[in-house]
Amino acid sequence: MDSYRIGVIRVLTTEDPELLNLHGRLLERYFPMFRVESRCIPDQYEAIHDDATMAAGVPKVVAMARQMYEEGFDAIIVSCAGDPGVREARSAVPIPVVGGGESTASLAQFYGGKAGTVGITADIPEAYTRILEGHIIPEAGIGK
């Protein structure tokens, strides 16, 4: 079986190896042909959750995508529902770059019907509203 070197970009800076590698371990469990290496972007201890953190984080995602491409990775996954830097990274490297938001919304669309979202902010990520237009369950008001 062929194997693929997959880079996972975490948009939350952490020194905790369990947290850093959590998504990569799941990917390797469900896709045994993946050899995953997870890295976090620097100086984003509050992750990417608003315009200011997006402006600071996107260039870091793109720089890490370039570095991973230069190191021979076969594909990159940006592990965040907001897909920060995904479009920009796709323009910067000639390998597949997949965002957590786009991939999840596309899978929900494939299965059809309505979809709900749960997130770290009250906002629904752009990829969800773009891909699932008209098929998102209205806000339930939890936590208000």
Predicted region positions:
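Short, well-structured alpha-helical segments in soluble
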Residues: A55-G72
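Short, flexible loop segments at the rims of nucleotide/cofactor-binding pockets, characterized by
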Residues: A52-G57, D74-I76, P94-P96
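Short, acidic/small-residue loops that bind anionic groups at enzyme active sites
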Residues: R90-Y111
